[in-house]
């Protein structure tokens, strides 16, 4: 198998040739089908404050990279590079022992039986990443979430976990994509015919659940995956009992001290 550096500028070209090449019939079908979805895709996949995330630029480009979306090549490469810098096991990624090619190959194979309108969402790359995270703290956070009945009340519904996986995968690349509600929703789109409004509402509910379980935190418009250490800090902050009377009394003392020149 060809080893493909995570920083390869031509990563998408290599992946297209090695993994995504299609026979003439499939290529022609996808190119002919693209105009039926072009406007919907362009209006659906609008990222906030993330200008470098590329979308399809032609019918041929759509057919060439299908079922993936162009932004995924650079975003995944950057994500894996940063994850490798934040975990010991993940260091294997940056040494080329795990090629970007393999991530796309395995994910394509997992989606081989999907309908022709299906797209790959970012969380669907996670099973390939999980093998290398092994027993890292971040992998344990997700594994424990999968066993939490408040997060997964129905074993057949793993959507809340999918949201958590996406937030982990983009945790260290906020220079590439801001983890806003809209952007998170975009990363979870799995069809060219996706009902984005319904998906957005589903994501919003998932975020509330994950916040209540202290697995993520909200920072203004952004939602951030929390490591074990960050969860502990959040717990300590939340356990500080500071009522309005305490604040008023402290403020009064400060004003008094200032007035009398203490």
Predicted regions and their residues:
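The catalytic "switch" region of P-loop NTPases
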Residues: 1-50, 209
